């Protein structure tokens, strides 16, 4: 059975958390009984007699599922490759370096960068405009959402979507913050990727607690 169009709120129900931080889920409150329970649920207390290993594995699994859902359905294989790559490049004893490398593999993707810049409402919309050929990096068309950016890259857009971009920028709250490694010119719709990022600077941009240590250790068994 194809699960591509499965309602996303059902995945939130399993994880007991609104992973994407979207406000649209609240609009369904009156229509969905289960969703209403989800929005008003209280965290249960773990039994003192619970097995520590079982709880540890469960916590690892939940964090992994949150990351996969937040970055729009990353496959288990893709996430495993990224974690292995971060572990190989970084010193196994240097936790901060591993975290910076892994978060860079997530956030340096062009679809994620467009989302962080507030140019699009979500990562799925970013993937769509990229696949349709509306995004250019250093004057070259990019059609792969997996394209990795480097410091100094200039991102531009086709004139066909300038109205959409302007609408998205205006709909964002004034308090919406763009990460320090991005500079956006709202007048000519150009985006500059200025410098490398770090995990510490991105902690406040996630609507949930991102425990990268659990994610990495899950695949380094």
Language model segments and positions:
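Ferredoxin-like alpha/beta domains used as RNA- or RNAP-binding modules
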Residues: 1-117, 143-221
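Short, well-ordered loop/turn sites that connect or cap secondary structure elements
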Residues: 123, 129-130, 135, 149
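Short strand-turn-strand beta-turns centered on an Asx-Gly dipeptide
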Residues: 137-139
